[in-house]
Amino acid sequence: MSKDTLFSAPIEKLGDFIFDESVAEVFPDMIQRSVPGYSNIITAIGMLASRFVTDQSNVYDLGCSRGAGILSIRRNVEKAGVRIIGVDNSEPMVERCRRHLEAYHSDIPVEILCDDIRHVEIKNASMVVLNFTLQFLPREDRLALLRKIYQGLNPNGVLVLSEKFTFEDNTINELLIDLHHTFKRANGYSELEVSQKRTALENVMRTDSIDTHKARLKEAGFSQVDLWFQCFNFGSMITIK
């Protein structure tokens, strides 16, 4: 696994964060060291798949990156006729995802698409995963995507939505941001790396509060919505149709 050193040296003209070749190469290391609880969420996605994925249905991972979520799902599904569709708009991510999945044998067919998740049809779905993806969409596009997911889910289908959160209480919000930065430093990132990456993400990742997510999911049609995992200002929600 390649180590993430992308922000270790001063960058004179720091642009917006993009999921390009350099990020795709180090992504597994980057996300493990940057997102508290990421491994737990990936493991639990597999557990949820074993409960919710049904025979002759589709599973979607929207923003699949290098395929960690898909692998977890595939290892835990024993139903007949299941098809997994992974979507990511980064060609370098898609290329690595395909190679990664090919390294592990499975009888469950997987299709990896390089596309905008807003343009992908959701149909006959027993499970949809949005793992730290929605926060990169323009806010005005989020409800429409969630409505499309709701309409494409079968009854009793599940949506797993993992996100970085903001908190309405400013004291709590600043505390959790600081704890997250402490977590990153404990994982070997320098103060410069933490600062430069935060700046690069400012214009591309727009986070919402848990209450905002819940209200939006309910507006999209979901009635059963709750938080099942949280570590600092990162967490995951489960919604059932």
Swiss-Prot record:
UniProt xrefs under PANTHER family: CARBOXY-S-ADENOSYL-L-METHIONINE SYNTHASE (PTHR43861:SF2), TRANS-ACONITATE 2-METHYLTRANSFERASE-RELATED (PTHR43861)
List the protein's name: Carboxy-S-adenosyl-L-methionine synthase
Instruction: Provide the taxonomic classification.
Output: Bacteria, Pseudomonadati, Pseudomonadota, Gammaproteobacteria, Pasteurellales
Give me the reactions it catalyses. Answer: prephenate + S-adenosyl-L-methionine = carboxy-S-adenosyl-L-methionine + 3-phenylpyruvate + H2O
Which amino acid positions bind S-adenosyl-L-methionine, per UniProt? Y38, G63, C64, S65, D88, N89, D116, I117, N131, R198
Q: What is the documented function of this protein?
A: Catalyzes the conversion of S-adenosyl-L-methionine (SAM) to carboxy-S-adenosyl-L-methionine (Cx-SAM).
Q: Which organism is it from?
A: Glaesserella parasuis serovar 5 (strain SH0165) (Haemophilus parasuis)
Q: Entry's HAMAP family?
A: Cx_SAM_synthase
Looking at the record's lineage, which domain of life comes first?
Bacteria
